[in-house]
């Protein structure tokens, strides 16, 4: 009889053979535009700290002050002993920032998606999601028990065809999409999705994780960027990317948020967000409001890199994520290593995370022109044209 765990070693060998095996890399000290990685100083193009707030002294001071006042942990679920005034202050600030009636904060963005999706739909319902949606949206859909179907990436035509074919068989229908797609950098056709939702009587949940703080005139996300403010939808986002903290949020009308507060298992049955993370996220919103030049500098950096690499097959992007597809996982690893040797940290992204391997570069507001020029030169020397 085989040992019950013997298959794990075989599976690890398969991952190695396919060049899919992953290992952690240890960064010393704070993150930022330049990092210390395993004894080397590298320019960091793998961070989602888009505005460079995670190491901002005001963020750190806010986290320290909250820890001194409230302690290191929230000490319970929000419905029991884990709710503090700073949690509600953050939720109200997010609601105002997103131009929504109310908001609810989860302990992570992943939990926000799982909890929200699973309490909105069930076995009698239909979910239609973009094929390139984030793992948290896909897993939330599976866990809900609803019938789940995917439409071709950013295809309004395929989405409507599936609505025509299936919508009438189900009680409720939920449309799911990232606004900025995390492994491509492109943006969903939000206005078209909302128009179809009105025609076919669907709820809409958008994941603003990579748009919050980055997209739109005020940095509120793609709902603003696409001119869809005031439309009826549910917005989810994260506090761990441009906001430089940890946690996730959901915004919408007051009744929806009240319903989520009463039904979302990943909010009800978990400890509240730590005081430090909560206070840091609240400070980030204030910095974003007061310093629009950070976001402007980020987009200047994005546009500079795009203009210098227009001869390469970069995937279309208006966000801080720029991707160069390559032939296979082995080539992705090889090119990432070449860049590492030139002082650039940009890990290879491989299946099953993405269908086709690629190098993924993320811009930050704190990258200097010199950092960007090193990246452009290194890519030119490393990538086949």
From Swiss-Prot:
Q: In which pathway does it act?
A: Cofactor biosynthesis; biotin biosynthesis
Pfam families (UniProt xref): Aminotran_1_2
- Cofactor(s) required for function per UniProt: pyridoxal 5'-phosphate
User: Which residues are listed for pyridoxal 5'-phosphate binding in this entry?
Assistant: 109-110, 182, 207-210, 238-241
Question: For binding substrate, which residues are annotated in this chain's numbering?
Answer: 22, 134, 353
Q: What CDD domains does its record include?
A: KBL_like
Q: Which GO terms describe its biological process?
A: biotin biosynthetic process
Q: Which cysteines are joined by disulfide bonds?
A: none
Q: Which residues carry this modification: N6-(pyridoxal phosphate)lysine?
A: 241
Regions crossing the membrane: none
PROSITE patterns assigned to the protein according to its UniProt record, in alphabetical order: AA_TRANSFER_CLASS_2
Q: Which Gene3D superfamilies match?
A: Aspartate Aminotransferase, domain 1, Type I PLP-dependent aspartate aminotransferase-like (Major domain)
InterPro entries cross-referenced by the UniProt entry: Aminotrans_II_pyridoxalP_BS, Aminotransferase_I/II_large, AON_synthase_class-II, AONS_Archaea/Proteobacteria, PyrdxlP-dep_Trfase, PyrdxlP-dep_Trfase_major, PyrdxlP-dep_Trfase_small
Q: What domain of life is recorded for the organism?
A: Bacteria
- Task of the protein: Catalyzes the decarboxylative condensation of pimeloyl-[acyl-carrier protein] and L-alanine to produce 8-amino-7-oxononanoate (AON), [acyl-carrier protein], and carbon dioxide.
Q: What is this protein called?
A: Putative 8-amino-7-oxononanoate synthase
Give the source species: Microcystis aeruginosa (strain NIES-843 / IAM M-2473)
Whichever gene encodes this chain, its name is: bioF
């Amino acid at each position: 009889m085989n040992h019950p765990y013997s298959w794990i070693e075989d599976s690890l060998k398969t991952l190695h053979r396919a060049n899919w095996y992953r290992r952690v890399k240890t960064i010393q000290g704070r993150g930022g535009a330049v990092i210390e990685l395993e004894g080397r100083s590298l320019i960091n193009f793998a961070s989602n700290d888009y505005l460079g707030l995670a190491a901002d002294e005001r963020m750190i001071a806010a986290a320290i002050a909250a820890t001194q006042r409230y302690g290191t942990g929230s000490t319970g679920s929000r419905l029991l002993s884990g709710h503090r005034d700073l949690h509600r202050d953050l939720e109200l600030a997010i609601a105002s920032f997103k131009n929504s009636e109310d908001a609810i904060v989860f302990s992570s963005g992943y939990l926000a998606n799982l909890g929200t999706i699973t309490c909105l739909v069930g076995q009698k319902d239909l979910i239609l999601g973009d094929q390139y949606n984030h793992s948290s949206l896909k897993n939330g859909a599976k866990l809900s028990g609803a019938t789940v179907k995917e439409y071709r990436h950013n295809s309004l035509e395929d989405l409507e065809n599936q609505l025509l074919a299936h919508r009438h068989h189900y009680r409720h229908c939920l449309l799911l999409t990232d606004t900025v797609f995390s492994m491509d950098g492109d943006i969903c056709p939000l206005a078209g999705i909302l128009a179809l939702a009105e025609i076919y009587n669907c709820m809409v949940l958008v994941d603003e994780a990579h748009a919050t703080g980055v997209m739109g005139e005020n940095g509120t996300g793609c709902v603003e960027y696409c001119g869809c403010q005031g439309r009826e939808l549910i917005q989810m986002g994260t506090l761990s990317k441009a906001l430089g903290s940890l946690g996730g949020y959901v915004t919408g009308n007051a009744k929806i948020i009240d319903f989520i507060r009463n039904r979302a298992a990943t909010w009800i049955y978990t400890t509240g967000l730590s005081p430090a993370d909560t206070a840091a996220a609240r400070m980030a919103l204030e910095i974003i409001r007061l310093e629009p030049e950070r976001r402007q500098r980020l987009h200047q950096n994005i546009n500079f890199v795009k203009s210098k690499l227009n001869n390469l097959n970069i995937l279309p992007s208006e966000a801080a994520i720029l991707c160069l597809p390559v032939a296979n996982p082995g080539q992705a690893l090889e090119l990432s290593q070449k860049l590492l040797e030139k002082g650039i940290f940009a890990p290879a992204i491989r299946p099953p995370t993405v269908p086709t391997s690629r190098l993924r570069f993320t811009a930050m507001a704190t990258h200097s022109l010199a950092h960007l020029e090193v990246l452009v030169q290194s890519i030119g020397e490393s990538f086949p044209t």
